Amino acid sequence: MNLENVLCQINAYHCILHLPSFRAVVSSNDHSGTLRCRAGRTATTPSPFDRAFLFGEGIYEVCLLVNGRFVDMDSHLARLDRSLAACGMTPPPERPQLERIINDLARRNGVTNGLAYLQVTPGATPRSFTAVPQDRATLFILTQAQDFLSAPHLSRGITVQVRPDIRWLHRDIKTIMLLPQVMAKRSALANGFDDTIFVDEQGITEGSSSNIFIVTDAGTLVTRPLSDHLLAGCTRQRIITLARDAGMTVEERIITRDELSRAPEVFATSATYLVVPITRIDDHVVGDGGIGTVTRRLQDAYIAFIRALAATGAP
């Protein structure tokens, strides 16, 4: 099934797809679903009254692509569904159809290593907090080429600052409202760090775009339990599964600020970070300043998992 045919089957969405030399859009005004493509320009754009523009209302996902295979796509799309349901937003196309669109877009763009970004927004309304969208929702997808498995930070590690978590209290919803995260990352760079770890009144919540793990002196892997205080990371869950399969002890509990400072190993996980060692926290060097034994073991296990998946080739 080619991309044009897939798009024409979707009646509830604009499908805005970033391609190398043009953007393809199914026009909301053309109910026949005709695909309009114009080199170097956009045939139809989302309305400036889309609630994503006016209120930051929308949900997104980022999925890693290696050798034409998306990693844990089922988990990412399941989380997308949960986030949309939590916000009362229109669900995306049926899972098999959405997967075909994403895979076809990656092929058309010639992207075999990189990521796919999906964003769902409610559509256009008058500027009112309570207005109910009457137009189609907007589904935006792009692919981006990048070799995340060769990223220097995988061996070099990253440095982080710790800052109060000022975000809202439904961090389990993967919303496009990312201003606190943007501010945290900019603050980190301005202060000579790579990233930020957030802390609330209980302890460590998560990184600005990652989940956080520590390794205790006894070799136990610890990460904060899932709640509305943090995102249910797909890579986080994969690492927990790989660790337990390898016979490691894993605890999901609160990590205090003091425990974070004393941990011999700390690392972050995300779709694009993979498993990245944290070598310095504020002015404190973690362990010997390099990648720890447990961190290396889990990083190797995760990359091996990805490579085994990628060896099967594009679907």
Residue locations for each model-derived region?
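Ordered, amphipathic secondary-structure segments that act as subunit-interaction surfaces
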Residues: 111-120
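Helix-start/capping segments and mature chain N-termini
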Residues: 26-104, 121, 130-315
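Short terminal hydrophobic/aromatic SLiMs and anchors at protein ends
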Residues: 14-15, 31
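Compositionally biased, low-complexity intrinsically disordered regions
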Residues: 1, 5, 20-21
